[in-house]
Amino acid sequence: MELFNKTAHELIDMIKSKEVKVEEVVKSYIARTECIDEKIGAYLYLSKESALKEAKLLDEKIQRGEKLKGLWGVPVGIKDNISVSGMQNTCASKILENYISPYDATVISRLKENNGIILGKLNMDEFAMGSSNENSAFKIVRNPWDLERIPGGSSGGSTAAVASREIPLSLGSETGGSVRQPAALCGVVGLKPTYGRISRYGVISFASTLDQVGTIGRDVTDCAILTEVISGFDKRDSTSARVAVPNYKESLKKDLTGIRIGLPKEFFKEDLDESIRKQIEDAIKILEKNGAEIKICSLPLAEYSLSAYYIISTAEASSNLARIDGIRYGRRINTLDKHEDIYIQSRNEGFGEEVKKRIMLGTYVLSKGCYEKYYEKALKVRTLIKEDFKRVLKEVDAIITPTSKVTAFKFGERTKEVLSMYSSDEYTVPASIAGLPAISIPCGFSKGLPVGFQLIGDYFREDILFNIGYSYEQSTDFHKIMAKL
């Protein structure tokens, strides 16, 4: 029995019924990872010993008749910018290469409380800055559907690991599309929750007003289970919301009667790949067949999201990354005498080119004379975009768009085309700017490469997104198809 081919919810049921042991499940994923990750590059660190030790402890509890909760020993992979006590937390950067986290992020504490087993730390774009996972300081991540193509980013390791069956569930981080975009390109489900739904405590910051922990799974049910486990208020995160967390599994039903889905014309422009357009149109027909009402709508300000995003995110990044200086912690150049020289050289050698580029851009937009001209204006645009979404979401329950206007491109294809690379998140950034929940659902293939559609919902209505996504899955098998490795 190939346990790595099972979904997380199938594994939970099998462990509950004592059909398999937790240790067997963990060993299956370790063996799978050791067999294929040399091709994929999804893992930066595999925590074999601690995972097997925890699996044995859980098996002993089950044998004693104790009822577990939550994940029942199902393994989870963690993006390497989320703190796990005793494990590396490099952000895929040379400057944090030897940094070991002394504490658990809130999401990790909640995983452990709900019997999730941490299997390792997953590769990413350095400090979550990138859309292709070509910016990792250690190694690139390859798309399981075509090893010569990118998996998307910045959570490319998290999505590629799930797609290649190296892990059933994973956590990524979202700033402008870093879970949804690679989820679409790798053919898995990826959720960005409402800003404030999931605690950011223990996540190394990129842009504090945009960052969120996202969940990734093989299907909507897996994603819903993981999201429920880690959601909820956290007093250690000042942006955490005091909003009750529903039982997301109860929202999973095929019937969409009464659900209104908006179709914004601004997301279906001429530059959208025709084969992707066809897949989205087919998905819409299925949702209609399942009872949903499709309504044409307009989000005229969405086109300004990308510009506002790259001003706001780089400004916040330049401030957040100032603390990584080689003096308090991080890689340190010890051959220099002056603190200023140590600071400059440590950061110059420790940060990659993309990170340095964004720090400089962010410093510029916050400088005298530019703050009002760029940063304040971007904040005003952000407010207008939020109001635009609020207007539409009074008339519909969710909005459907493509997740990405292209499928996975080849390595090096866009590295020298900055605008082309930055536009990779064109369809995901609007929801991030507005702080809304959004999910990517696999909906087909274009020339053998996965395609996904995006659902955007109202604040704290992840349940509706799960409902629509689940309904679609009940009429299709795209989420079940596995890449041949």
UniProtKB/Swiss-Prot annotation:
The keyword Heme does not apply. GO terms for cellular component: glutamyl-tRNA(Gln) amidotransferase complex. It comes from the Bacteria. InterPro entries: Amidase, Amidase_dom, AS_sf, GatA. Signal peptide: none annotated. The active site is at K79, S154, S178. Its EC number is 6.3.5.7. Disulfide bonds: none annotated. It holds the Pfam family Amidase. One of its GO terms (molecular function) is ATP binding. One of its GO terms (biological process) is translation. The keyword Protein transport does not apply. It catalyses: L-glutamyl-tRNA(Gln) + L-glutamine + ATP + H2O = L-glutaminyl-tRNA(Gln) + L-glutamate + ADP + phosphate + H(+). Keywords: ATP-binding, Ligase, Nucleotide-binding, Protein biosynthesis. It is an enzyme of class 6 (ligase). Allows the formation of correctly charged Gln-tRNA(Gln) through the transamidation of misacylated Glu-tRNA(Gln) in organisms which lack glutaminyl-tRNA synthetase. The reaction takes place in the presence of glutamine and ATP through an activated gamma-phospho-Glu-tRNA(Gln). Heterotrimer of A, B and C subunits. PANTHER family: GLUTAMYL-TRNA(GLN) AMIDOTRANSFERASE SUBUNIT A, TRANSAMIDASE. Belongs to the amidase family. GatA subfamily. This is Glutamyl-tRNA(Gln) amidotransferase subunit A. It comes from Clostridium novyi (strain NT). The lineage of its organism: Bacteria, Bacillati, Bacillota, Clostridia, Eubacteriales. The gene is gatA.
